[in-house]
Amino acid sequence: VSCPIDIDPRAQDAIAALPAEALLALAEALAVLELAPGGAGRSVNPDLNPDAAVRNLPFGGTGMITYLVLERDRRVDVLLITWA
């Protein structure tokens, strides 16, 4: 069962600014998030709270998706997209 993904407007702006070579990797990472959000990434604070709802998922070698898993709503909110 897939979870819908909601992308924050700031993350949408970051996506619009990504280089073309990052877009396929991002699409693949978002597909993984849709199918397995809790197991896809790693907690933003793995030492103190490994099961945290706010997680990071790397993509494309230098990209990072920061997202929130809303288990109750069966939804994923993408908060930030970064590319270095």
Language model feature labels by segment:
Residues 1-64, 69-84:
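Basic, Lys/Arg-enriched alpha-helical interface segments
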